[in-house]
Amino acid sequence: MIVEAREIDEIGTEGIIKKIWERVGNNPAYLSVDIDVLDPAFAPATGTPETGGWSTRELRTIIRGLDGMKLLGMDLVEVATPYDTAAEHTTMAAADVIYEVLSVMVKTPLSK
């Protein structure tokens, strides 16, 4: 399933969370996050910057909305740290994403 950055304008973070849950349900899932879903203001160091992308807060909200989902694993792609700003915006955003996903993963065991 692919969620495009522009969908946030139409259905908001809650709509995106709902769309993901409807697709995944109670099944185990693997999450792949492309950092270029974030606007270059929040993550400029990527191979394909997406103007009009999400804020870091919006992405964190969506990930937190997956609380209870059985995530098997995740990857975070397109982080090009050599191109990051001195403030390391992309690196910090990437760390936030990983932290949020790991938080969801440790709270929801895959089996009981």
Range-by-range predicted roles:
Residues 3-112:
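Catalytic cores of soluble, metal-dependent hydrolases
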